[in-house]
Amino acid sequence: MSLFHYIYKILFLVILFTISSTCFSETISIKGLVFSDLKINEVFANQKITSGYLTIENTNKKDEHLIHLVSNFSEKTELHNMTVENDIMKMKHVDKGITIKANSKLIFRPGSFHIMFIKLLKPLKVMNKYKVIFTFQNAG
């Protein structure tokens, strides 16, 4: 597969997250992927890390694979998952991405999959919208 063909198959999505104690009510639908319940946890004084949550529904007939995230307000943006090992909750970086099965939903929530925004570059204000770029492998 040529580099051009590979790049062509990757879909970049810009999703706006809102910081608040409730979820952002807007639903965004692009290429058979539906994004809803967007939220970034509130950031307190001098805090340099926070997490984000959302629901991604794949309405396509093919599985989709979320392979990369980037934001303009943190040095690193990573996918993480919480697991229990020997009765201890552990958070792990998911470096190979996440598959969203065809015609199913993946819910990012506390205690499960979530997005980590690491080394925040600026204070995040409540009710402001922030850009996060999602890169998918197929997008339908």
What positions do the PLM features span?
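Bacterial N-terminal signal peptides that target proteins for export
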Residues: 2-11
